[in-house]
Amino acid sequence: LNLILQTVILAILGMAVYARLKHSMVKHAALMGSGIALHTVAIGAIMVPSLLSMGALLRKLLTSFALLTIVHATLGSIVEILGVCLVATWLSNRTNVEKCFKRKNIMRVTIALWLTELILGIFVYMMLYLPA
């Protein structure tokens, strides 16, 4: 379920980038906000409970699975914080697009980290559910 949700979020982010390229800033911001909201739901409803249920798998911190999961969760937390901050900044002053332009580099870092985190999440999924 989470992998499907992450694919939907990726599609939403793709549409948001397309809206930005078409100079539709309001649509871009709304789509990004929707993506962050879905990501927040996925973290709270799926990822955190899943992580908490893996206690036995994560007890040995020096295994590749545990290290990969920790890096994935850490990057995911950073992405979530950056995304929420970016959306909150936009929501606090929707009429001033210049403030958003000033955060362009933070947006780029956020999307790069999110894509990295997504790839790591796919590896975690493969390690859990595909035969070795």
Task: Cite the ranges covered by each PLM segment.
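Alpha-helical membrane insertion/targeting regions
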Residues: 1-132
